[in-house]
A protein has these predicted regions:
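Terminal-region recognition feature
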Residues: 1-192, 196-197, 201-202, 208
């Protein structure tokens, strides 16, 4: 990925707003940024501390802990699709923060990669409605940018009560495997590490 230099454009703040107005806007923006950080923290918490503890008691790491160990020291992963399914409530008052999968641009061995990791703090890494779309979107970006794609697999398959919403349509789960094939056909490296459950759709990832 290329470095894009940022240069100022347009008038300076002093030319378009007085200090009082600028201060009011800064305060309003700070409130919105706090809300964004809180929402991001909620997604990153998955189903909560009890589920993080359950993962650790199995001797495993969470998806984001694995991601932190994978990336180059001193670098920061850039998550995409963080708020997919955020605020949605499924039958039984179930939630799927981030659609149960972490997708992120990350530096690995000095090279930008796309990382796709099942969030094992959300229904043991199950796929939910819009999980396939999120994975496919990450694969599409990897294909366009020719980024090696790394799958961190710890997946219990589809979340069965919602499976009818995950398979059908032009963006259904099967199209993930089409993207696997397209990435291979275009010479984009794909690697998979299996760290736990590898069931149903999730089981195809390291094979294809």
């Amino acid at each position: 990925m290329s470095l894009v230099p940022l240069v100022p454009i347009g008038d300076t703040l002093a030319h378009i707003a007085d200090e009082r107005t600028a201060a009011e806007h800064r305060e309003a923006l700070a409130v919105l940024e706090d809300r964004l950080r809180a929402a991001r923290a909620e997604v990153e918490a998955g189903w909560g501390p009890a589920y993080v503890d359950r993962v650790h008691k199995k001797g495993k790491l969470t998806a984001r802990e694995r991601l932190a160990m994978l990336i180059d020291p001193g670098t920061t992963p850039r998550e995409v699709g963080t708020f997919v399914n955020h605020g949605d409530v499924f039958p039984g008052d179930q939630k799927s923060p981030g659609a149960g999968v972490v997708t992120a641009f990350a530096r690995v061995e000095g090279r930008w990669c796309m990382v796709i990791a099942n969030d094992n703090t959300v229904a043991s890494g199950a796929w939910w409605p819009r999980t396939p779309e999120k994975i496919q979107r990450a694969q599409e970006m990897a294909l366009r940018l020719r980024l090696p794609t790394i799958y961190l697999v710890d997946c219990s398959g589809l979340f069965l009560p919602e499976q009818s919403k995950s398979f059908p349509g032009a963006r259904g789960a099967g199209h993930i495997f089409k993207m696997n094939s397209l990435l291979s056909a275009h010479g984009v490296p794909q690697l998979a590490g299996v760290f736990g459950d590898c069931i149903a759709g999730g089981g195809y990832m390291p094979i294809i």
